[in-house]
Amino acid sequence: MTLTTPLAGSRPPYRSASESLAVAPGSRRRYLRAASVLAIFGAAAFFIDLPVAEWCKAGRVPKDLLRLLNLSEVFAHSAGATCILVTALFLDRGLRFPSFRWPAARWPSFQPSAAQERMARMICTTAAGGLAVDLIKLLVDRIRPRAADLGSQASALGTFGDAALAAASASHSDYNSFPSGHAAVATGLAAALTWRYPRGALLFGAFAASASLQRVATSAHYPSDICLGAALALAGAAIFLGDIAPDEAAKA
Protein backbone atom coordinates (compact mmCIF):
# COMPACT_ATOMS: atom_id res chain seq x y z
CA MET A 1 0.00 0.00 0.00
CA THR A 2 1.46 3.34 -1.04
CA LEU A 3 0.64 6.54 0.83
CA THR A 4 0.79 9.80 -1.05
CA THR A 5 0.88 13.33 0.34
CA PRO A 6 -1.46 15.77 -1.42
CA LEU A 7 0.29 18.66 -3.09
CA ALA A 8 0.00 22.10 -1.51
CA GLY A 9 -3.06 23.82 -2.93
CA SER A 10 -4.73 20.57 -4.05
CA ARG A 11 -8.40 20.29 -3.19
CA PRO A 12 -11.08 17.64 -2.84
CA PRO A 13 -13.42 17.33 -5.83
CA TYR A 14 -16.31 19.12 -4.09
CA ARG A 15 -14.32 22.36 -3.66
CA SER A 16 -14.18 24.88 -6.48
CA ALA A 17 -10.97 26.57 -7.63
CA SER A 18 -12.08 29.81 -5.99
CA GLU A 19 -12.16 28.02 -2.62
CA SER A 20 -8.58 26.78 -2.90
CA LEU A 21 -5.59 28.46 -1.34
CA ALA A 22 -3.07 29.90 -3.77
CA VAL A 23 0.40 28.41 -4.19
CA ALA A 24 3.61 30.42 -3.69
CA PRO A 25 6.59 28.36 -4.91
CA GLY A 26 9.65 28.76 -2.70
CA SER A 27 7.94 29.18 0.67
CA ARG A 28 8.75 25.64 1.73
CA ARG A 29 12.42 26.19 0.92
CA ARG A 30 12.47 29.30 3.11
CA TYR A 31 11.11 27.36 6.07
CA LEU A 32 13.68 24.63 5.50
CA ARG A 33 16.53 27.14 5.19
CA ALA A 34 15.49 28.80 8.45
CA ALA A 35 15.26 25.39 10.12
CA SER A 36 18.74 24.52 8.83
CA VAL A 37 20.18 27.77 10.17
CA LEU A 38 18.67 27.13 13.60
CA ALA A 39 20.00 23.57 13.56
CA ILE A 40 23.49 24.91 12.83
CA PHE A 41 23.10 27.43 15.65
CA GLY A 42 21.99 24.58 17.89
CA ALA A 43 25.10 22.57 17.08
CA ALA A 44 27.33 25.60 17.68
CA ALA A 45 25.51 26.34 20.95
CA PHE A 46 26.93 23.17 22.51
CA PHE A 47 30.11 25.20 23.05
CA ILE A 48 28.27 27.75 25.22
CA ASP A 49 25.69 25.48 26.86
CA LEU A 50 27.61 24.97 30.10
CA PRO A 51 28.74 28.56 30.80
CA VAL A 52 25.30 29.96 29.97
CA ALA A 53 23.57 27.33 32.11
CA GLU A 54 25.92 27.99 35.04
CA TRP A 55 25.34 31.75 34.75
CA CYS A 56 21.56 31.36 34.77
CA LYS A 57 21.59 28.75 37.53
CA ALA A 58 23.58 31.14 39.72
CA GLY A 59 20.61 33.53 39.66
CA ARG A 60 22.32 36.25 37.66
CA VAL A 61 19.39 36.96 35.35
CA PRO A 62 17.94 40.37 36.36
CA LYS A 63 14.68 39.89 38.23
CA ASP A 64 12.71 42.34 36.10
CA LEU A 65 13.87 40.61 32.93
CA LEU A 66 13.06 37.21 34.40
CA ARG A 67 9.58 38.40 35.33
CA LEU A 68 9.00 39.56 31.74
CA LEU A 69 10.28 36.29 30.31
CA ASN A 70 8.07 34.29 32.66
CA LEU A 71 5.01 36.14 31.35
CA SER A 72 5.90 35.14 27.81
CA GLU A 73 5.82 31.43 28.66
CA VAL A 74 2.10 31.36 27.87
CA PHE A 75 3.04 31.60 24.17
CA ALA A 76 5.01 28.35 24.45
CA HIS A 77 2.67 26.32 26.64
CA SER A 78 0.26 23.96 24.92
CA ALA A 79 -2.67 25.39 26.87
CA GLY A 80 -1.64 28.94 26.01
CA ALA A 81 -1.17 28.10 22.34
CA THR A 82 -4.60 26.46 22.29
CA CYS A 83 -6.21 29.58 23.77
CA ILE A 84 -4.51 31.78 21.19
CA LEU A 85 -5.66 29.60 18.28
CA VAL A 86 -9.21 29.46 19.68
CA THR A 87 -9.19 33.26 19.93
CA ALA A 88 -8.11 33.53 16.29
CA LEU A 89 -10.88 31.09 15.34
CA PHE A 90 -13.53 33.24 17.02
CA LEU A 91 -12.26 36.59 15.71
CA ASP A 92 -11.20 35.68 12.17
CA ARG A 93 -14.07 35.04 9.75
CA GLY A 94 -11.62 33.38 7.39
CA LEU A 95 -11.11 30.49 9.82
CA ARG A 96 -13.44 27.62 10.68
CA PHE A 97 -12.97 24.64 12.95
CA PRO A 98 -11.64 21.77 10.83
CA SER A 99 -13.48 18.54 10.15
CA PHE A 100 -12.09 15.29 11.53
CA ARG A 101 -14.14 13.06 9.23
CA TRP A 102 -12.52 11.07 6.45
CA PRO A 103 -11.13 12.18 4.02
CA ALA A 104 -10.81 15.60 5.71
CA ALA A 105 -8.65 14.05 8.44
CA ARG A 106 -6.24 12.71 5.82
CA TRP A 107 -4.55 16.05 5.11
CA PRO A 108 -5.44 19.77 5.50
CA SER A 109 -6.07 20.21 1.77
CA PHE A 110 -8.91 17.66 2.02
CA GLN A 111 -10.91 19.88 4.36
CA PRO A 112 -14.42 20.74 3.09
CA SER A 113 -13.71 24.48 2.86
CA ALA A 114 -10.75 26.83 2.52
CA ALA A 115 -11.50 28.32 5.95
CA GLN A 116 -11.29 24.88 7.54
CA GLU A 117 -8.10 24.12 5.64
CA ARG A 118 -6.47 27.29 6.97
CA MET A 119 -7.31 26.39 10.55
CA ALA A 120 -6.17 22.80 10.08
CA ARG A 121 -2.83 23.99 8.73
CA MET A 122 -2.37 26.37 11.65
CA ILE A 123 -3.17 23.67 14.21
CA CYS A 124 -0.86 21.12 12.58
CA THR A 125 1.97 23.64 12.27
CA THR A 126 1.70 24.57 15.94
CA ALA A 127 1.64 20.96 17.11
CA ALA A 128 4.12 19.33 14.72
CA GLY A 129 7.34 20.50 16.35
CA GLY A 130 6.13 19.68 19.83
CA LEU A 131 5.17 16.14 18.82
CA ALA A 132 8.56 15.61 17.17
CA VAL A 133 10.27 16.84 20.35
CA ASP A 134 8.26 14.42 22.49
CA LEU A 135 9.38 11.54 20.29
CA ILE A 136 13.04 12.53 20.61
CA LYS A 137 12.70 12.88 24.39
CA LEU A 138 11.60 9.24 24.52
CA LEU A 139 14.84 8.22 22.84
CA VAL A 140 17.39 10.69 24.22
CA ASP A 141 18.04 11.60 27.87
CA ARG A 142 19.63 14.91 28.78
CA ILE A 143 19.74 16.29 32.30
CA ARG A 144 18.17 19.72 32.66
CA PRO A 145 20.49 22.46 33.98
CA ARG A 146 18.49 22.75 37.20
CA ALA A 147 19.20 19.08 38.02
CA ALA A 148 22.73 18.78 36.63
CA ASP A 149 26.12 19.02 38.30
CA LEU A 150 27.37 21.49 35.72
CA GLY A 151 30.73 22.18 37.33
CA SER A 152 31.90 18.59 36.96
CA GLN A 153 31.24 18.37 33.22
CA ALA A 154 34.07 18.75 30.72
CA SER A 155 31.68 19.56 27.88
CA ALA A 156 28.00 19.86 27.11
CA LEU A 157 28.02 16.29 25.85
CA GLY A 158 28.41 15.18 29.46
CA THR A 159 24.86 16.34 30.16
CA PHE A 160 23.46 13.54 28.00
CA GLY A 161 22.58 10.33 29.79
CA ASP A 162 22.41 10.37 33.59
CA ALA A 163 26.07 10.89 34.54
CA ALA A 164 25.55 14.62 35.12
CA LEU A 165 22.68 14.17 37.55
CA ALA A 166 23.40 16.16 40.71
CA ALA A 167 20.98 14.32 43.03
CA ALA A 168 20.47 10.63 43.65
CA SER A 169 16.77 10.96 42.86
CA ALA A 170 15.20 13.04 40.13
CA SER A 171 11.84 13.40 38.44
CA HIS A 172 11.23 12.03 34.97
CA SER A 173 11.10 15.60 33.65
CA ASP A 174 14.68 16.23 34.75
CA TYR A 175 15.86 13.81 32.05
CA ASN A 176 13.92 15.59 29.28
CA SER A 177 16.02 18.62 28.46
CA PHE A 178 16.69 17.76 24.81
CA PRO A 179 15.23 19.39 22.79
CA SER A 180 12.89 22.10 24.07
CA GLY A 181 9.19 21.43 23.62
CA HIS A 182 8.33 24.97 24.68
CA ALA A 183 10.58 26.42 21.98
CA ALA A 184 9.04 24.08 19.41
CA VAL A 185 5.46 25.04 20.31
CA ALA A 186 6.26 28.76 20.45
CA THR A 187 8.04 28.72 17.10
CA GLY A 188 5.35 26.61 15.46
CA LEU A 189 2.65 28.95 16.77
CA ALA A 190 4.60 31.98 15.57
CA ALA A 191 4.97 30.43 12.11
CA ALA A 192 1.25 29.63 11.94
CA LEU A 193 0.19 33.11 13.06
CA THR A 194 2.67 34.79 10.72
CA TRP A 195 1.35 32.73 7.82
CA ARG A 196 -2.18 33.92 8.52
CA TYR A 197 -1.32 37.45 9.70
CA PRO A 198 1.95 38.48 7.96
CA ARG A 199 1.91 42.00 9.44
CA GLY A 200 2.47 40.54 12.90
CA ALA A 201 5.60 38.61 11.95
CA LEU A 202 7.98 40.62 14.14
CA LEU A 203 5.60 40.54 17.11
CA PHE A 204 5.02 36.80 16.87
CA GLY A 205 8.74 36.20 16.43
CA ALA A 206 9.50 38.29 19.51
CA PHE A 207 6.98 36.33 21.57
CA ALA A 208 8.49 33.03 20.43
CA ALA A 209 12.03 34.22 21.17
CA SER A 210 11.05 35.47 24.64
CA ALA A 211 9.26 32.24 25.48
CA SER A 212 12.27 30.22 24.34
CA LEU A 213 14.75 32.34 26.29
CA GLN A 214 12.59 31.90 29.37
CA ARG A 215 13.44 28.21 29.31
CA VAL A 216 17.16 28.99 29.44
CA ALA A 217 16.80 31.72 32.06
CA THR A 218 14.91 29.40 34.41
CA SER A 219 17.47 26.57 34.02
CA ALA A 220 14.96 24.32 32.27
CA HIS A 221 16.98 24.08 29.04
CA TYR A 222 20.34 24.75 27.43
CA PRO A 223 20.70 27.15 24.46
CA SER A 224 21.18 24.21 22.09
CA ASP A 225 17.86 22.73 23.25
CA ILE A 226 15.83 25.76 22.24
CA CYS A 227 17.59 26.19 18.88
CA LEU A 228 16.96 22.59 17.90
CA GLY A 229 13.39 22.67 19.18
CA ALA A 230 12.71 25.74 17.05
CA ALA A 231 14.35 24.06 14.05
CA LEU A 232 11.97 21.11 14.36
CA ALA A 233 9.02 23.50 14.48
CA LEU A 234 10.06 25.20 11.24
CA ALA A 235 10.52 21.82 9.61
CA GLY A 236 6.91 21.15 10.60
CA ALA A 237 5.90 24.48 9.06
CA ALA A 238 7.57 23.42 5.82
CA ILE A 239 5.38 20.31 5.80
CA PHE A 240 2.04 21.81 6.75
CA LEU A 241 2.29 25.35 5.36
CA GLY A 242 4.56 24.43 2.48
CA ASP A 243 4.11 26.60 -0.58
CA ILE A 244 0.74 28.08 0.36
CA ALA A 245 0.83 31.82 -0.29
CA PRO A 246 0.89 33.88 2.94
CA ASP A 247 -0.84 36.84 1.24
CA GLU A 248 -3.66 34.61 0.05
CA ALA A 249 -4.00 33.11 3.51
CA ALA A 250 -4.46 36.57 5.00
CA LYS A 251 -7.60 37.21 2.95
CA ALA A 252 -10.85 36.33 4.69
What kind of region is each of these model predictions?
Residues 48, 90-91, 96, 128, ...:
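Hydrophobic membrane-targeting signal helices
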Residues 24-32, 36, 61-71, 75, ...:
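Structural motif marking the loop-to-transmembrane transition
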Residues 2-102, 138-150, 154-158, 169:
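N-terminal transmembrane-helix/juxtamembrane module of multi-pass inner/ER membrane proteins
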Residues 40-47, 130-135, 208-219:
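Aromatic-anchored segments of alpha-helical transmembrane domains
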